[in-house]
Every structure is written in C-alpha cells, then in structure tokens.
C-alpha cells in the first residue's frame, strides 16, 4: 500500500508517473499531502477482484493492516485500470501480495515490469498462502526469476 506516501514520493523522482494505492483513510489523507503532482493516487487496495472488505487496523503501526472479511474498504484490480505502461511494480501489502498479483495478470503479461514484493510470511499468517507463493507463481506463470533479495523484499525480473 501507499501508506503515507514516502515511497511514492521517492519513486516520483525516478519515474515520469507513479501510481499508488492506499485503502486506510487516515494514511491516505497523509499520502495526498506528501506526494508530488506526478503521483496518481487512489484510496483503494489492490486484490484479485473488485470487492469491499473489512480491515484490521493496528493503532501503533500505520503500516500493519490486514484484510479480514466484508466491510467498506474498496479493493480494485490493477488490470481494471488499463494502465498505459508499467515498468516497475512494487507491492508491500501486508501479505496480500499473491492476491494483488493475480489482479495484475494482464498488466504483468503485457508490460513485463520489474516486480518487487515484500515476503515476510504475512500471507501465510493472515490468508493461509505460503510465504513464497507470489514468488513461485511469478516464476511458474510468467517466467520471472529472482534477481535479488533485500531484507524481506524480493526483486523479480523477466527471463
């Protein structure tokens, strides 16, 4: 997620256009104030299908939310946006990376972006999805390979 916009603002210095998504209303309000004009932002989360979900929020950590059933948080797919380009896809969505990637199949197939995902075991804890499933899925379905692992992030590139 976009959180409060720190990463999006940094990426905006390197890319002509940056898209960021943040479902938490408080984080989103901060994000809007923190990003430059070349950052397109939406108050929504990314997933494998359009839905409205509930979210557990941790008051002592504004980046540690997770989805937990129905609610009023909007989830969209990256494919549903029909982006004109995608060179780099970075997902730090607290274990929802496998689902967000499933909603980006067409985008990944069309643009073959460099993909960075956080992989710290939250997909298993919150959703019953193996820690490395997103990585394995990208390798199996799209022929990606791991280029580098940095702390809890995995950077994958097309073969």
Predicted segments with their positions:
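Phosphate/nucleotide-binding beta-alpha loop and adjacent structural elements of enzyme active sites
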Residues: 2-159
């Amino acid at each position: 997620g976009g959180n409060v916009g720190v990463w999006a603002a940094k990426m905006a210095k390197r890319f002509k256009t940056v898209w960021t998504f943040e479902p938490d209303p408080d984080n989103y309000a901060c994000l809007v104030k923190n990003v430059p004009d070349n950052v397109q932002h939406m108050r929504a989360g990314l997933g494998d299908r359009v839905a409205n979900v509930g979210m557990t929020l941790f008051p002592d950590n504004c980046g540690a939310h997770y989805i937990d059933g129905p609610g009023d948080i909007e989830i969209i797919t990256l494919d549903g946006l029909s982006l004109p380009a995608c060179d780099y896809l970075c997902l730090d969505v607290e274990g929802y990376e496998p689902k967000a990637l499933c909603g980006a199949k067409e985008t990944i197939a069309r643009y073959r972006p460099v993909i960075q995902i956080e992989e710290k075991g939250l997909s298993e804890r919150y959703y019953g999805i193996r820690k490395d499933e997103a990585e394995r899925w990208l390798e199996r379905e799209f022929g990606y390979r791991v280029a580098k692992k940095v702390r809890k992030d995995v950077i994958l590139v097309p073969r």
